[in-house]
C-alpha cells in the first residue's frame, strides 16, 4: 500500500513540476504560443495527421515565429523568412547544433553531416565541402547523363509495351544511381541487394518525420532508446549495406588516386578507430539517404503537376523544344535558356517543399531575435510548408503558378534547401539532377492521367514530404 502511495505521489509531483516548467515566465520578451497541457505540451493540437499544416494554421494566430511545446521540448516554429535569415545567417553560430534525441542517437550516434553538432560538425562540413571541390565533376556528370539515358530508355519500353509509368519507383532508382556513382564511383545494379533498400529508406524517412512521443518526453528517453535499438530493422539494413561497401572500398583504396567521395573521406578520417569508421559510414549514410529521397520525391511531384495542369505542361514542352532546336537531348548548359522550365521546378519546390520542417536545430545560448527572446537549448523548426504558404511573400500561395518565379528578383521566402552555414551541402547537385531528368522526360513524353481525373495532391508527412498515394500516369512519346 505504501509503495502505491509513493508511486501516486511521484506521478502527481511529476505532473505538477511538468506543468510549472511549461507555464513559468522565462523572459519579458518571451514568445507567445498556444496553451500547453501537462506532459503532452501542445501535441494535442496536431490532429490532422499532417503536422506541418497544423503548425501553419497556428501561425495564422501567432505569426511567423511562435512557441510550441513538443511534449517536454520548448520549440520555436518559424515561417518568416526575415527572422529565419536573422537566425541562421546573421546569428548562425548560435544555431548550428542538433537536438539529442533517442531516434537520432540510434540512427547515427550523432555522427555524420546531418545530425552532429559543435566542433565535430564543423570539421565534417569542411571535409565535405573540400570533397565537393575535389571530386571529378566531369566523371559524375557524365554518369548523370547516362542515368538520364537509362531513365528515358526504361520509359520508352514502358510506352511501347502500352504500360503505365510509376514515377516513384523509377525516380527513386534514378536518384539512387546518381548518388551511388558520386559516393562509390560505381554503376548501380538494381538486380542485386540495393533494390531491397528502397523500402527501408522510405520507411526511415517516414518514421523520422512522423516522430515519436517518447523522443520528446524526457522521462521516457532511456527506455525508448533501448527499445528502438532492439526493434528497428530498417536502419540496420541500410547501415550494414554501407559498412559492407566501405570495407570493400578500403581493400582497393589508393591514397594517390581519388576515385570518389568515399576515397576522400577515407583519406581525411581513416585511422582504423571505430569512431572514425562510424564517422565515415554515418556521413555517406546521410548523403545517400538525403540525396536519394528528397530529389526523387520532388521529381514525382513535378510529374503530378504536369498531369494536373496540362496547359502548363505544354508551355514547358514548347520552351524546351525550342531550346534544343532539333537535338534529342537537353543538356545542363541549356538551363540558362529555359526560364519557364526553371520556374516550374522552383514552383514545385515551393508548392510541395522537399521537407516539412527539416532536421531541427537547437540554440547554444539565450539570444534575442528581432525583439523575441529565445532560450538556450530551444528546439528550432523551420516550417517550410508554412513558409511556402506565407501570403506576405507569395500571392495566392495555394495556387500552382510557375510564372511567379519569372520575375528576376529573388523571392526571399524561397528557401527549399534551408539557408546559412548549415544549409543543404548537395543542393547544387540536386538541382542539376532534377533539371536534367525533368527536362529530358518532358522533351520525350507527354504525361496524362490514366482515368481522366486529377491526381490527389495530398502529401504524406515525414522528413521528406512525399505524395500520400503512389500513382501511375500514361505516357505518350513526343519524339
UniProtKB/Swiss-Prot annotation:
Q: Which cofactors are named for this entry?
A: heme
Q: Which Gene3D superfamilies match?
A: Cytochrome P450
InterPro entries assigned to the protein according to its UniProt record, in alphabetical order: Cyt_P450, Cyt_P450_CS, Cyt_P450_E_grp-I, Cyt_P450_sf
What is the recorded membrane topology of this protein?
Single-pass membrane protein
User: Which parts pass through the membrane?
Assistant: 1-21
**UniProt cross-references to Pfam families, sorted A to Z:** p450 (PF00067)
- Which UniProt keywords are given for this protein, alphabetically ordered? Heme, Iron, Membrane, Metal-binding, Monooxygenase, Oxidoreductase, Transmembrane, Transmembrane helix
* EC main group: oxidoreductase
Record-linked CDD domains: CYP1_2-like
Highest taxon above the source species: Eukaryota
Molecular function as annotated in GO: heme binding; iron ion binding; monooxygenase activity; oxidoreductase activity, acting on paired donors, with incorporation or reduction of molecular oxygen
Tell me the compartments it is located in: Membrane
Q: Which cellular component terms (GO) are annotated to the entry?
A: membrane
Record flagged with keyword Glycoprotein: no
Report the EC code(s) recorded for this entry. Answer: 1.14.-.-
Q: Which residues bind heme?
A: 424
Q: Which family does it belong to?
A: Belongs to the cytochrome P450 family.
Q: Which PANTHER family match?
A: CYTOCHROME P450 307A1-RELATED, HEME-BINDING MONOOXYGENASE FAMILY
Instruction: List the protein's name.
Output: Probable cytochrome P450 508A3
UniProt lineage: Eukaryota, Amoebozoa, Evosea, Eumycetozoa, Dictyostelia
